[in-house]
UniProtKB/Swiss-Prot annotation:
Cellular component per GO, a single term: Sec61 translocon complex
Compartments where located: Endoplasmic reticulum membrane
Protein family per UniProt: Belongs to the SecY/SEC61-alpha family.
Protein origin, superkingdom: Eukaryota
Protein name per the record: Sec sixty-one protein homolog
Miscellaneous comment text of the record: Present with 704 molecules/cell in log phase SD medium.
Swiss-Prot/TrEMBL GO biological process terms: post-translational protein targeting to membrane, translocation; SRP-dependent cotranslational protein targeting to membrane; SRP-dependent cotranslational protein targeting to membrane, translocation
Transmembrane annotation, as ranges: 33-53, 122-142, 147-167, 175-195, 243-263, 294-314, 340-360, 362-382, 422-442, 450-470
UniProt-listed PANTHER family: SECY/SEC61-ALPHA FAMILY MEMBER
Regions of this protein lying in the Lumenal compartment: 54-121, 168-174, 264-293, 361, 443-449
Annotated Pfam families: Plug_translocon (PF10559), SecY (PF00344)
Membrane topology field: Multi-pass membrane protein
PROSITE patterns: SECY_1
Length: 490
């Protein structure tokens, strides 16, 4: 016997597990574009409010994961309450465990690959079920819910989770480009940036039914015309409100986006030559952001698990009573503008401050602990991921050998050794830089938007690279040639 394998536990449920079939033939470039765009649009249009919630004026339990939502496409009190987190986390965690040989799986065998994909899907669905019921019984959706209400909320959130999982699988199975979850997440982050700047949705922010626009620019315009604020007061509010997007955070987010865009072009070019034809020289680029945004995603995945576990203990067990022994040890949640559940010390050590000045004056230690956590986890992940994801120095050296390529001035047997001097350093340095940008942005009070824009920009560039390669290989007959006016298009 080969022993127990974790992937084997999904075998009994394979007949009832929903699955997207592989396409019968390779899809044309234009079809993949359509599938990719519509997958993102369908997810965006799925942000329906939950049905069956008590019509309370003010929720008793506010949002404990407000600073994590922007990274995983989560929308509070909608069908997308937990967004893409279960899908992204299940893929990252299980692939990491498989690469570290914690999970026994042979990716060279098709049946093992299929079982692993099914395990990833089941793990994501189970997370949707667990998260839904944690929030239900913690009182996030209201107190004293009836059995019908509990069942209805479960049906909506778990059903939406299964739908989201299958929607991402459509892209993963070859109907679109790259990773389905990453593509959808990139679309959501881009949309959120527009909504945070120009959103007209009115959100209640006070006890007296006072509302403000979600978009920072729209809020400025309304503030200048408001009867409840002076001209100067409207401008100040537009730049410094800490419970909804403001112009200061919008400017910082755009600055971070520009920096990440620039970092995408930073690379080391290694001179290479062909071993099959003389005089054929070129360069092999190794990007600074070698592992992309995955290091930041991993750090925030671990943060999500930590804060959900803390939420269970503080809210579900201790009922958020400051006098309870659990709250004395872990801290409790404080209400911020009837929207956010802000953790207190010591849980606040692993949560970014809601504003820079509040962080400096009330929780200065957070800058050290939060930054250290993001940096250490990101660097550790990048170092492990580059070694197990098929892009290590040894893997690249094997690709060179298969393609008849070698480093200029180096023997073929020394290629892996030379690449090993560059690739791990690039992966770790890139992860360090992205983590540092993230913690600086979050320390300024961006509430997850810094991490979100880092993930969105890096994910967008990865998608663009995949589309570009696909277009060069099979996009010659694409209808986009005619639209873009490419010379020689039919």
């Amino acid at each position: 016997m080969s022993g127990f394998r974790l992937i084997d536990i999904v075998k009994p449920i394979l007949p009832i597990l929903p699955e997207v079939e592989l396409p019968f033939e390779k899809l044309p470039f234009d079809d993949k574009i359509v599938y990719t765009i519509f997958a993102g649009l369908i997810y965006l249009f799925a942000q329906f409010p939950l049905v069956g919630l008590p019509k309370a004026t003010t929720p008793n339990v506010n949002d404990p994961i407000y600073f994590l939502r922007g990274v995983f496409g989560c929308e509070p009190r909608t069908l997308l309450e937990f967004g893409l987190f279960p899908n992204i986390s299940s893929g990252l965690i299980l692939q990491l465990l498989a690469g570290l040989k914690v999970i026994k799986v042979n990716f060279k065998i098709q049946s093992d690959r299929e079982l692993f994909q099914s395990l990833t899907k089941v793990f994501a669905i189970v997370q949707y079920v667990i998260l839904t019921n944690i929030f239900i019984f913690a009182g996030y959706f209201g107190d004293d819910l009836s059995v019908v209400q509990i069942g209805l909320i479960n049906f909506q959130l778990v059903g939406a989770g299964i739908f989201t999982t299958l929607l991402a699988e459509v892209i993963d199975k070859g109907f679109g480009f790259s990773s389905g979850a990453m593509i959808i997440n990139t679309v959501v982050i881009a949309t959120n940036l527009v909504a945070d700047t120009f959103g007209v949705s009115q959100i209640k922010v006070g006890e007296d039914d006072q509302t403000e626009a979600q978009g920072a620019l729209i809020n400025l315009i309304q503030g200048l015309r408001s009867k409840h604020k002076t001209f100067i007061g409207g401008i100040i509010s537009a730049f410094n409100r800490d419970y909804l997007p403001n112009l200061t955070t919008t400017i910082i987010v755009l600055a971070i986006a520009i920096i990440v865009c620039y970092l995408q072009s930073v690379r080391v070019e290694l001179p290479i030559r062909s071993t099959r034809a003389r005089g054929t020289n070129n360069v092999y680029p190794i990007k600074l952001l070698y592992t992309g945004c995955l290091s930041v995603l991993f750090s925030y995945t671990i943060l999500f698990y930590i804060h959900i576990f803390a939420f269970v203990l503080i809210q579900l067990v201790a009922k958020n009573e400051p006098t309870h022994i659990i709250c004395k040890i872990m801290g409790h949640y404080e209400n911020a503008n009837n929207l956010l559940a802000v953790p207190t010390f010591p849980l606040s050590l692993l949560a970014p401050p809601t504003s820079f000045f509040k962080g400096v004056t009330q929780q200065p230690l957070t800058f050290i602990t939060y930054s250290a956590f993001i940096l250490v986890t990101g660097i550790w992940f990048a170092d492990k991921w580059q070694a197990i994801s098929g892009s290590s120095a040894r893997d690249v050296a094997l690709e060179f050998k298969d393609q008849g390529i070698t480093l200029m001035g180096r023997r073929e047997q020394n290629v892996a050794k030379e690449l090993n001097k560059v690739i791990p350093i690039a992966a770790v340095t890139g992860a360090s830089v992205l983590s540092l940008i993230t913690v600086i942005g979050e320390s300024l009070g961006l509430k997850g938007k810094a991490a979100g824009i880092v993930v969105g920009i890096a994910g967008g560039f990865s998608l663009l690279e995949v589309i570009t390669i696909e277009y060069q290989q099979s996009g010659g007959q694409s209808a986009l040639n005619q639209v873009l006016g490419v010379p020689g298009a039919m």
